[in-house]
Amino acid sequence: LVDAGVSDKKELMSNPKFAELLKGFGVEPPLKISTTTDKETFAFAKSDEGFKALLNHDNEKVQSLVAARLGTKSTLEETRTQRFIDIARRGLLPVPVRYYAAHTGRWGGDDKINLQNLPSRGPNGKKLKSSIVAPEGYSLIDCDSSQIEARVLAWLAGQDDLTNAFAKGDDVYKHMASSIYNVPSDGVSKDQRFVGKTTILGAGYGMGAPKFQAQLQTFGFDMELDEARRIIDIYRSTNGAISQLWRDANNMVQYMARGDSVQFGKDGVLQVDARKNAIMLPSGLPMFYHGLAAEKSDRGYEYTYRTRKGPNRIYGGKVVENVCQAIARCIIGHQMILLAKKYKAVLTVHDSIITCVRDEELDEAQAYMEECMSQTPDWAEGLPITCESGTGKSYGECE
């Protein structure tokens, strides 16, 4: 580390500085397409294949540098573990939650206890989750809304064949793989189904071939760019209504910026209030794009809106993603209200709700919870909702 010029851990934690350290040893930093910005960024996550490969680099100094970076990052996990230990000494685990943490209204962690991103992979995998246990005589139920964003997307776009497949309980990942590889659904291999799953869950918001290729690589699945491009083309041609929704949303951004109020989505279910720069969701929740403005660029006009972190670019696919996540959030909230008639939610993580019940009520409570989380709100008629649940004495056992 001294040879590399590392003086403190800040140089290891900073992506640009760490990239310069690698270049000092003649190593080009691995890159990926950011799923947040759609731009090229450093692939320095411990799950990134290019980064993991550096642990076996021919130069031992590069190996040491990468190991030190991973060790520094692991201190964050150590800090959270210590926080759990300190809380356990005081009694029960509080679950502080920010009610509207993201632009789409998703809940978020607070008070230095972020239960939204507990690790589930790696050497310490589920240890933190398994440390969250029910009191004596109680059990936990973890119920997850299955594929909720993909279902919302199909319903919102009026992609009726996909919506009907979800409603019938078909394996839509196999169906997608069947179209991609031109094989019968019952002949789809495990790897082919994985590609079908990644396509259904990833390509629905306008993802391009380079980003799709990069996403597969993060799972250790190598694919040529031409093949990734072929798969994206098949997804878009197979799901024409979804592709049209992106275009409609892109036009909507332009209309909103001009001050024109319009409708889009299935049967005009999304109402645009241009005076407030807001999209009114069918649940009644407004989603704002404050300070929406057009900027001239080499590619024409680009649109941005104001956030606490500065201007954020917005376009058709991103609008659709925002709307689907916000609608999914509203559905989870609706389900929590139904559940609260009999049982209290003790935690919500992404698309799942966790409750704590007496052991003698476990089967009844699990059945009631699945019933609540399979109900579609009145404002989302025709949207097929389903769920999966697990039980255990600890949060980790529920999965």
Predicted regions and their residues:
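Alpha-helical scaffolds flanking conserved acidic
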Residues: S189-T199, Y343-K344
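Extended amphipathic alpha-helical segments enriched in small hydrophobics
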Residues: T199-L216
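Catalytic palm subdomain of template-directed nucleic-acid polymerases
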Residues: L153, K211-M223, R236, G240, ...
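Short, positively charged loop/turn segments that connect secondary-structure elements
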Residues: S185, F221-I231
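A general structural motif at alpha-helix termini
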Residues: P16, L22, L216, I232-Y235
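Helix-rich, typically C-terminal accessory recognition domains appended to large enzymatic cores
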Residues: K211-F212, I332-G333, C387
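Acidic, glycine-rich two-metal-ion catalytic cores of nucleic acid-processing enzymes
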Residues: D8-G187, L245-S352, D359-E360, Q366-C372
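Polymerase palm active-site segment centered on the conserved acidic dipeptide of motif C
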Residues: L1-E11, E227, I231-R258, E360-E399
